[in-house]
């Protein structure tokens, strides 16, 4: 096998810390495996002294298989382990020595931490936990453990976390369960391993003597705690060889961070950093476009993927009306592709898999899915829909009503519910409520209205029920209040329910359809089809001749919670995730966005827009804080040269007015010549970058009522908007809000121009 000079340098590295920054398709696994062989054959290192830490068990099995195909004489002598398997070995041996007994409650389908916590919570509080609630808890719990954060402090500092009271209650209960029953989970394997090697010098010395050379694959996905464990074991020889790509760090929810790689030199001052920047996988234009995408991030090593072939390929962008048409277009394109080529259909959210599975089922297309963790029919929103529909079928069912009454925007008091315990068995709940003494007019009207709403709901077709529940019964208002910081836009779930409800009359038929889809997805995990559907996270490390990235919708990718968090690091991770998706493609790349979700207009993802406008003079800009970009470009055909546009907004012209003392102007709609300027006596910086004033970022903030935004210098977010809807307003009103990040102060300015 012929290696590049970069690969040879990495393979020949012997002792001391080394970081190999490898772009997608650069042959990093090949390099890691050949370095093992080089250590054994050229440096006489015993096989038992080398350990390779892999990201997943399946990855380790595959790497061992590849190594033994070329070197069968080393069967049973080479060690590939996940970090959890490595730590389990440490913890198990230490506990055996010290006669400590603990039971691992992960990796066992019959006896796992989710079931244990669900049962314990119900036994203690007589309430059932939803899948969303328990998944939210373990996401936060796992993250804090791997980042070595205090759980309670993290909850206090992060106000974006919904239902913090419940999260804290679950934290206390879960730790209590583990303590009382001598349980441990995967997090505890890491925590205990770190504790044992920190306090037991004999144990640490034994590990140092046994493993002299550490290799870590997918180093960008290693958490802070995992890095710390390895750092202690390799010290002071520091024979650690890490293969990574900071641009593919997509597991922050597991405690991973690109900063672990960016700080490598400070942790290991005498380390060597190797760059493997030749991409042998993708065509020239796929590499070029993906390079431009990832350069939008700031927290990264500066590097570029280099192509190794001049072969051109297709990058096609589709903007279609809705998910149904998106599915049809995917089928159409698949039929045009050589049946011997591989196809990967990638998505940000697991819920998208059901759109694809449904259309493939209807077209008799076989497909493979690695895993599908989204259990749709146990989803909180679907359960609510189910209960609301069940109650419409029998409005005397008090048990069902108790599960939904506080979600109907009716302000029903708990006292009212208590009094309903004495109602007649067959009496309508609303009739019983109307019989209560001393109801004011509000409640009389509300209960009468709800009684009539549920009568109408019962008579509707399944497809029509969804909008009625959302907009008429009041469930949409409940979700708006509850879902402010949720990862998933609930319109995506409602859209899917309606999508799957086509030609279905009853809710029972709908549930039956979900069961069929569930069985199809289960069988697909054993399929040998060359068509795969996968989350982007699960596709990492894989490659396909053709890649479809679907559902590129603002608020879904990047996720709503990321855009609402104003956290630049989270937005950068979403960009890395998109970069990972793009770089799975070898020959062709198809990107899809839609115009409507749940019959409501939606905007394309900022990443889709960046690709769509990649040939403009100036690229899409976006400021820290997670705001989407607004295209800024030079309009050569008018006397007003600087223009920007975003979404359905018309082109706005920006120009330099040389005559007035207020030189910077832009024209919007029928209001030409609005003046923007730098007043040295205020804290407002320059508003637009043009001519001699570089570095100001202009962008469109779609997620707030202040749509036109730009940032400059230390003022991270400057908000500008035209309040056209202000009641009784005759003046053109612009508002500026500057946020000084050095002291977190905010200043607001209101300017009025009276235009004829």
Q: Where are the regions a protein language model picked out?
A:
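Thr-biased low-complexity repeat/linker tracts and other Thr-enriched repetitive architectures
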Residues: 613-720
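Helix-hairpin-helix
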Residues: 402-424
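Conserved motor-region signature of P-loop NTPase helicases/translocases
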Residues: 1-62, 224-241, 246-395, 531, ...
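Accessory/regulatory regions of helicases
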Residues: 360, 553-619, 626, 636, ...
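Short basic/glycine-enriched coil/helix segment immediately N-terminal to the Walker B
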Residues: 199-212, 235
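Conserved helicase core region in the C-terminal RecA-like lobe
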Residues: 81-89, 215-218, 243, 408, ...
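Accessory C-terminal helicase-associated subdomains
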Residues: 434-538, 542-543, 559
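A basic/glycine-biased coupling hinge at the interface between accessory DNA-binding modules
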Residues: 17, 23-26, 37-192, 209, ...
